[in-house]
Amino acid sequence: MDQSRRRWLQRSGALCATGLLGSWPHLASAGTRAKAGAFGPLEAPDAHGVQLPAGFNARLLASSGQFVRGTDFRWHAAPDGGATFATPDRGWVYVSNAEVPDHQGGVGALRFDSRGEIVAAYSILTGTTRNCAGGPTPWGTWLSCEEVANGMVYECDPLRSGQGIVRPLLGTYWHEAAAVDPKTGFIYLTEDDQEGRLYRFRPQFYGQLDTGILEAALVGLDRTISWVPVPTDAPYRGDDSTAFARGEGAWIAADNLYFATTADHRVWAYSIRTSHLEVIYDAIALGEDAILYEPDNLTMHAQTGALLVAEDAGDLQLILLAPRAGRWEAVPLVRFEGHGGSEVTGPAFSPDGTRLYVSSQRGRDGEHGMTFEITGPFLGLTRKS
């Protein structure tokens, strides 16, 4: 990232720092920059502009508007949030949202056999608007979220072609991501708006989203969160809740909810057990040492506990955040060179943790998205340099 843009981002982040969360203490846990990547520096870009460390390789799987190889299915425009799901035949499915306006969005799916080869491609949702991120559920469905003022969440079956079911009780607002607590079935939802809220849906019955209560987070002075019941028919902006500066990706692991806010360049961790909230990465606090700006989609490598965070813009990187010695270390894992009009979207690992799926939303020409599979020694993600 050039220095003028970095300074502009720092100023814009400071302008966002105007409320309770803006004045959040710059804690020691707000991240640190690694001297070198866990696998060494990124190498020269490949033919598609993908930069990876030594030992990693990228394969282009699908391009917007083109038939997925071996199928009669055209890949959608603007691929965004994604996830993988295991299949009974030891394969898996990768789903990808289409962030397209005017009811032209939806969700596409790539099905792989046990060897990692594509055997089918199909749609699991159509006719929706700006499907941004979302999240997988423990019961095997995909929650696809619309990022518009009247946005809704749709629950989709990833394993077969079909149409999702709208879930209005999850709220009507600028939806971004959804993360489900596997223990309780509670769903945590982010909102991509400058005055967005962090929401929680408490279903009456585990895995059933047609009854339950929607709540918004209120952050106390002691950095603990309490939850306030809110209506479901419009974005909530009550004074009894806390604004987050454009909520983005979300993921739950080991009783912690991790989520990003792109306007103030932060990644957060909320302890579901203790209700405590903390900042684990803060680009503004790090200043010139920061390498991750405008954090967006995120996912976790289940086998190692490493957190991967995609940049909305910035240097078009996928950044590894890994806990070491009580701090979160940030290192680049993927960078897209020559994709200046794009953003990094949809990171998700195969169920066995050996393959990473990720997209350049608008590709090298600024119009046609590119979805990749990256292979390499991912099981060493937490290894020190």
Give residue spans per PLM region:
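Sequence/structural signature of beta-propeller domains
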Residues: 8-385
